[in-house]
Amino acid sequence: MEVLMAERANLVFHNKVIDGTAIKRLISRLIDHFGMAYTSHILDQVKTLGFQQATATSISLGIDDLLTIPSKGWLVQDAEQQSLILEKHHHYGNVHAVEKLRQSIEIWYATSEYLRQEMNPNFRMTDPFNPVHMMSFSGARGNASQVHQLVGMRGLMSDPQGQMIDLPIQSNLREGLSLTEYIISCYGARKGVVDTAVRQSDAGYLTRRLVEVVQHIVVRRTDCGTIRGISVSPRNKSRMMSERIFIQTLIGRVLADDIYIGSRCVAFRNQDLGIGLVNRFITFGTQPISIRTPFTCRSTSWICRLCYGRSPTHGDLVELGEAVGIIAGQSIGEPGTQLTLRTFHTGGVFTGGTAEHVRAPYNGKIKFNEDLVHSTRTRHGHPAFLCYIDLSVIIESEDIIHSVTIPPKSFLLVQNDQYVESEQVIAEIREGTYTFQFKERVRKYIYSDSEGGMHWSTDVSHAPEFTYSNVHLLPKTSHLWILSGGSCGSSLILFSIHKDQDQMNIPFLSVERKSISSLSVNNDQVSQKFFSSDFSDKKILIPNYSELNGIVGTSHYNFIYSAIFHENSDLLAKRRRNRFLIPFQSIQEQEQEKEFIPHSGISVEIPINGIFRRNSIFAFFDDPRYRRKSSGILKYGTLKADSIIQKEDMIEYRGVQKFKTKYEMKVDRFFFIPEEVHILPESSAIMVENYSIIGVDTRITLNIRSQVGGLIRVERKKKRIELKIFSGDIHFPDKTDKISRHSGILIPPGRGKTNSKESKIVKNWIYVQRITPTKKKFFVLVRPVATYEIADSINLATLFPKDLFREKDNIQLRVFNYILYGNGKPTRGISDTSIQLVRTCLVLNWDQDNKNSSLEEVRAFFVEVNTKGLIRDFIRIGLVKSHISYIRKRNNPSSEKKEGSDHSMNPFYSISPKAGILHQSLRQNHGTIRMFLNRNRNPILLILSSSNCFRIGPFNHVKYHNVINQSIKKKTSNYIKNCRAPYGTAIQILIFIHFAFTKLINQISCIKYLHLQTSNVFFPVIHSYLIDENGRIFNLDPYSNLVLNPFKLNWYFLHQNYNNNYCEETSTIISLGQFFCENVCIAKKEPYLKSGQVLIVQRDSVVIRSAKPYLATPGAKVHGHYREILYEGDTLVTFIYEKSRSGDITQGLPKVEQVLEVRSIDSISLNLEKRIKGWNRCITRILGIPWGFLIGAELTIVQSRISLVNKIKQVYRSQGVQIHNRHIEIIVRQITSKVLVSEEGMSNVFLPGELIGLLRAERTGRALEEAICYRAVLLGITRASLNTQSFISEASFQETARVLAKAALRGRIDWLKGLKENVVLGGVIPPGPGSQRIGALSTATYQHSFGKNKNYLIRGRYERYFILPQGILCLFYQIQNLPFLELH
C-alpha cells in the first residue's frame, strides 16, 4: 500500500481538455504499462465517469447555441461577385457552359469548405463550452458536416442520382431557407430515405441474381487434380501490390506449386497458407507464388476443397457438401444492401475536390523553359501552359532566387518573364485520380436561347460525323453564332411568290408556326393554295385557271406552269442529300398506250432551295431495258465518250453517296461482260482454290453457293477478299495465235477462233481474256458478251407532256442519254439490287442575258390548284432576277423613276441623297425576307426586322485607311447593278460617276490571299452597304449610282487627346460581315457593342445584327447545318466531359451491377467485350484457326476474369468493405465459363452459335480427336442464369413459359444436380447429407488420359501443353509478364 502511495505521489496531474487522438495515445500507454486486462478496467471507470458527468451537466442544444460564423457574410459576397464575373464571361462567349459549371462548382465548394474550417476555431475563441461545439468536436453527437449546415451554409446539393445542382444554398438552417432554397434542399434532404427504399430493392434483386447463378456450386471433392495456378507477386513491375493486399490475397489459399528459396523447398504443393508462411514469403522475397483458385478448378458444376481453400468461418479447409456458391452470392449482395444506409445523414450535400494552387512567395520575375510546356486551356477556360514532366520555375527578385518544381500534368498560369506579386497563383496542380475512384463521361446539351440562323467559322468541320446526319465535329476552339431573326415557320412559303430579299410588312406573315401546315419530305402529300400579291395596298389575288393542262403565264410573273402531274396524282417527295426526288405515281388511263413509257420510272430532281444552275438535271428516267441483275464489266464499241464533269457545257451530276461521273453516249452500241463477284471479309474460310473450275451451286464458303459455273479468281485486298467467277470456255492456243496475246479483246461474230486442235466460227460477240496462273503457263478464257444497241432518240412525248417543252424566258429542256459507267469500269450490285447502265436525263438550260449584268436563276416550285373541285399539282419553273432593283420593279413598275416613292423598301433606313439626312431609322413595321432551311430541312422564311438590329454611331474623327480625296466628274446613264460573289473575290469596276472619290495608295489584301492592285483605280466614298446571308453585298441607296468596294470596307477611328496634343490611332477595324462579342469597345468614348454581325456600314455609323455567341471546344458536337434555322430550345451543341462520381455506395452499387451484367460502364473504362474480340482476332491470326481459337479463348477468359475481379473489389474497397476474392471469383467463374461455337471449321457435335462450357468443349475435342472452333464470350449474371444445365432452375428465375417450351421442343433432361431444382421438386438438396447421393449419380473420378509426368496443361507460369494424335505441340505462355494477370 505504501508503495502505491509513493508511486501516486510521483505522478503528474494533467488538467486539460483532450481529444480523440490524445485518448488513443493514453490507451496505448496504459496497455504497454499495465496490460490489456487492467487497461479495460480503467477504461470502464472512465466511461462511468463520463456518463455521470454528462448526466449531471445535462448538456442540451438550443437554437441560441447555433452561432453563425462572422466571416460568412463577406465570403458569400465574394463568391457571388466571382459568379457574376463568370456569368458575364459566359455571356460574352469567353467560356462555354461546361467551363462555367466547373468553375461555379469550385467557387461555392471552396467557400463552403472555408466556412467549415473556420467553424471550430471560431467556437474555440468565442465560446469553447458551447454545446454544439462540444458535441461535434468530441464526436459524441453529430459531425462537422452536420454542424456546418446548422451554422455555416448548406452549399451545393446533390440530387438522388448523384448529380450536382449548380444553384448553391447560401443560407444555413439557423438562418432559415428561402422558398427556392427549400425546394432545392428537398432534393438532397430526402436522399437518404430515397436510397434506403429504392437502393434497398436494387441490392436485394442483385443478391437474388447472384445466388441464382451460383446456387448449384457445392464442394463435392477434395482434389480435382488440376495443376493450373494464378501467379501472385508483390513486386510486379507495372503495379506494386501493397503488403496488406498481398497478405489478404494469400491467406486461406492452397499452393499450386512448390515454393523454393534458393535450393530449399519451404512450401509444398496443395499446402494451405497461413499468416506465418505468408510472412516468411514477404521476408525472404521469394519468386511469384502460384496459388489455386476457383478459376483453376477442372470441375464443371461443382468445386473441390483445395481450389476453394479455407473456410472463413472456422479457418480450416472447407467441408464437403458446403454450398459455397450461395455463400458467395450473399457475401457480395448483402454488403450492397447494408451500404445503402451509409449516407452519414448529410442530407445529400455535395462533396468534391479542388485543385491545389502554387503561389509565389514574394514579388519577382518568372523564368522557365518554354520548350517543356505548350499552351492549352484550363478546365475553367483560362489560358495556361501544360507541362508533361517536372518543370523547374525560378522566381527572381532583387536579392533572392527561388526555385519551385511543378509536377507533371499541371497548369502554369503565368508567362515567361512575367512579373508576379507575392501570394499570386502561378500554377495549378490537379489532385491525383486516387481522390475519386469513379469517373464518368457526361454529355451536356446546350440549347439555343433565341431564334435565328446558325453560323459558324471555318473551324467547324463541315463533313458530318455520320452520313446523312446533322452532327458536325469541332476540331478546335471556336464560336458558334445564332443570328437573330423572327421566323415565319411555314415550309410552304418557299412555293409562294415571296422571294429572297423581298421587302414586306412584317404583320403580313406574322403567323403562328403551329397554324401553318408543313411539307414533309417523307412521302406526305403536298397541299398549298397558290396566291399572289404585288406588295402594295391591293388585295391578294387568286388566279382563275380555265384550262387544266394549259400554260398559265402573265406578264407580271413570267413563270411557266406545266401540268406535269395528272389527275389525282399524289406528289411524293424523297430526301436525297440536298435535293428532292419526286417519282411519278400515276398517269391518266387514256394515255397508257404501248408506245408510252410507264411514268413510274420517271423521277424529277429539284434542289431543296428550288434554285437550278445552268445545265443541271431536272428529271431522269431509267430504262428497264438497260438494267442488269448481275455484276460485270462495261466495254464501249468506240472510244467516243466524254466525261460530263470535264466538259463545261455538260452536266455535273450529284449522286446519293458520292459524285458519280456520267459519260455522254456517242456510240450506237456497248457491251456488258457478266461475271459473278463476291466480296468477303478477310477472315472468311474459302472452300475453293484460285484458278480452279467449279460448277453451278458449288459451295464457296459456309453460307455462299455459286450461281454460275466457271473459272475462280481470288484476289486478296486490304481487309477483304474479292472472289470472281468467270463463265465461258477455256482454250489452250498455239504460240502462233496472235489474238490470245492480248489481255482482253472483243471479237465480232463471224471471225474464226483457231487453237491447236479445232477451228470455230463465232456467231455472237465474245470477249477473249488471257489468264496466266504461272509465268510459264497460260490459257485463254472465252467469255460471253451481252450486246446493247442504242435505239433511236426517245420521243419527248413519251416522257413528258408537250406543254412542258414550250419555251418561255429562253428556258430550254433537252433529252440526253448517258452511260453511268466508264469504259472498262466494273459494275457491282449490292445485295439483290439491279444495276442501271444507261440513264435518260432531262437537262435544263437557258440563254444568259448579256445586256443585263444581274444574275438570272431558274426556280422551281410546287403548287396545288383547286379548280371546280379538281385538285391539280403543278411544277412552276421560271427565271428570276435576284437583285433589289428587280424587286422594286416587280412591286410597282410605274414608280420606277419617282424619287421618294419607295422609301419603305429598306427595313433599316431610307436615305435621300439631296437632303442627306436619315428620314427613317430602323423601321419597326418592315422586314427583309431571308430564305433558309430549318432543323427538319423544310424551307422556311426568316424575317429580319429592325427589332433584330441596333445602330451605333455617329462616330467622330473618322478617317479612311490609306486613302486621299480626289474629285472626278463623269457622266453615266445606267444604274450600277449589285454584284454577288464569294468572300475574297476582287470585283471588276464597271462605271465611275460624279462623286467624291478616294484614291487608294496601297494595295488592299483581300480575304483568301487574293490581292487587288489598286494603285490607279478610283473608288467612291460609300454611304452604306448591306450584307446578307448569301454573301451578297448591296448598296442600299436606291437613288445613287455607287460602285461598291466589297469585302474590305475598313474604318480606323482617331480620337483627339487634348491634354497631350496628339492623335491616338486605335487598331480596331470594322468590316462587313465581321462578328463582335459583347462588351468589345471599338473606339474610346464610344458605346460598347453588343454581340452581333456588322450588317451595314455607313459613313459615320454601323448597323449590327444581334447575335448570340456560343463558345465550343474541341470534341464538341454541333447539331445542325450551316445557316440552318434554329428555334428557341433547339439543341445546339453537345459537350462531352469527365465528371467525378459521388463516393457513396448509391453510385457504386449500380457499377457493381453493370460489371456483373457485363454492360459498358462508361466510355473511359476499358470495354471487356472489345478486348475479348481483339484477343480472339490477334491470336487467331498469329497461330492459325484451330490452335488460335483454343489458346485465344483460354487466355481471353483468364484476362477478363481477373479484370472483373479487380473492378468489383475496387468498388467495395472504396467503401471500406472487405470481401474475400474467392467469393467474387466463384461468381465471375460462372459468367465467363461459356464459349460460343463459331462457324469456322465444321463440327459434328455442336451447332454454330451454341453456348457451351469451356471445359466441355475441350473434353469433347479430345474425345473426338477433332478441333472444335469457338471463341470466348462474356455473359451477364442474368444471361448466365438462363443458360444453365437445369431448365427447372431457368424457368423458376425468368421467362417461365419460353424456357419450358424450348426445353420441351428440344427434349432436354434435367439431372437435378443443383439446389434450386431439388427444392422445387421436393427432393434431397445437394448440400450437406445430400451431397453424397448427388456425387454417386455423377461420373466417377475423372481419370486423365495422360500420365502425371506428362499431362501438365498449365504448370508454374501458366505453361500450356496441347497433345495431338500426331505428336506433341508445346506452347508456352509466360503470363507473369502480362500486367493484367494479377489478383488484388
UniProtKB/Swiss-Prot annotation:
Its cofactor is Zn(2+). It catalyses: RNA(n) + a ribonucleoside 5'-triphosphate = RNA(n+1) + diphosphate. One of its GO terms (cellular component) is DNA-directed RNA polymerase complex. Binds 1 Zn(2+) ion per subunit. It is found in: Plastid, Chloroplast. Its EC number is 2.7.7.6. Zn(2+) binds at residues 224, 297, 304, 307. SUPFAM superfamilies: beta and beta-prime subunits of DNA dependent RNA-polymerase (SSF64484). HAMAP family: RNApol_bact_RpoC2. Belongs to the RNA polymerase beta' chain family. RpoC2 subfamily. DNA-dependent RNA polymerase catalyzes the transcription of DNA into RNA using the four ribonucleoside triphosphates as substrates. This is DNA-directed RNA polymerase subunit beta''. It comes from Sinapis alba. The gene is rpoC2.
